[in-house]
């Protein structure tokens, strides 16, 4: 059986996390040549490349498996040494989360865990359609995703759904939709997307108004909180989780442009199996809070 030296695995992990050999060397306090040598040792051991040497480097399929193994072992090792029960070194937890969860329910859900255990979070923000891929690549130990099926050697639980409403300010609605939300009016109304791969707005318009993707003007803004600000100031119409704008809707600062229509995204919590004690606490906290604030039907 091929048993990798975890020192060499940490070199592979550093290259991926630091997005290059030079910064990985600085992180590990060794030379860049030593980093390359350790990864070469790993590749010789497994008889195949573990890195695709692009900019930034990315792991091969075998490299992803090894990184996942490393992160799981590190979690279990830290807990075995007692670092999650009063030890001096905070336990690093890398999680992939979507921006809307981070802006609404995720941090309150994690509050009791953070208060109870010395944890250092590394939250990697990614669209909910792509967070599971970070888990597959071994970059994180848990992910909030819309994918219901678990990866091999992983566990999954349903968290609940975020309901997205198509909203804008009243002045925006009066300007762009004086006769209601129509197909022709939507073609002129500025919208906003999180990034070029965010299809939430386009999917809603295609499903309900038969508008093809790319047919409406769309800003690109990588911030869930900025979506709310853009809508409040009358700059755009956009899809925002109901959970995020309850106060604005109640006060009339924002209005639901299409009552009776919404976009529902069911969320799932993925993580490696077996769970460490700390990850079990995280899972319990996310499931408990998610079932209080997310739609369960």
Curated annotation (Swiss-Prot):
PROSITE patterns: HTH_LYSR. Residues 4-60 form the HTH lysR-type domain. GO terms for molecular function: DNA binding; DNA-binding transcription factor activity. It comes from the Bacteria. Keywords: DNA-binding, Transcription, Transcription regulation. Residues 21-40 bind DNA. Belongs to the LysR transcriptional regulatory family. Homodimer. PANTHER family: HTH-TYPE TRANSCRIPTIONAL REGULATOR ARGP, TRANSCRIPTIONAL REGULATOR. Controls the transcription of genes involved in arginine and lysine metabolism. NCBIfam families: argP (TIGR03298), PRK03635.1 (NF002964), PRK13348.1 (NF009888). This is HTH-type transcriptional regulator ArgP.
């Amino acid at each position: 059986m091929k048993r990798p030296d975890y020192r060499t695995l940490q070199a592979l992990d550093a290259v991926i996390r630091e997005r290059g050999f030079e910064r990985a060397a600085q992180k590990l306090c060794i030379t860049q040549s030593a980093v390359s040598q350790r990864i070469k040792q790993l590749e010789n051991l497994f008889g195949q490349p573990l890195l695709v040497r692009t900019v930034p480097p990315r792991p091969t399929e075998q490299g992803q498996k090894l990184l996942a193994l490393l992160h799981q072992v590190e979690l279990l090792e830290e807990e075995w040494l007692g670092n999650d029960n009063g030890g001096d070194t905070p336990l690093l937890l890398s999680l992939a989360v979507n921006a809307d969860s981070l802006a609404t329910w995720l941090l309150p859900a994690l509050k009791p865990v953070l208060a109870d255990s010395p944890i250092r979070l590394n939250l990697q923000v990614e669209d909910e359609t792509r967070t599971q891929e970070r888990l597959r690549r071994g970059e994180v130990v848990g992910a909030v995703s819309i994918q219901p099926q678990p990866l091999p050697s992983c566990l999954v639980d349903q968290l609940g759904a975020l309901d997205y409403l198509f909203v804008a300010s009243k002045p925006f609605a009066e300007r762009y939709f004086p006769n209601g939300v129509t197909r022709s009016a939507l073609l002129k109304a500025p919208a906003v997307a999180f990034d070029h791969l965010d299809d939430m707005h386009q999917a809603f318009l295609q499903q309900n108004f038969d508008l093809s993707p790319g047919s409406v003007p769309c800003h690109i803004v990588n911030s869930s909180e900025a979506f709310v600000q853009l809508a409040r100031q009358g700059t755009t119409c956009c899809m925002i989780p109901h959970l995020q704008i309850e106060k604005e809707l109640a006060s009339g600062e924002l209005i639901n442009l299409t009552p009776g229509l919404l976009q529902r995204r069911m969320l799932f919590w993925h993580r490696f199996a077996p769970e460490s004690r700390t990850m079990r606490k995280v899972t319990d906290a996310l499931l408990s809070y998610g079932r209080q604030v997310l739609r369960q039907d």
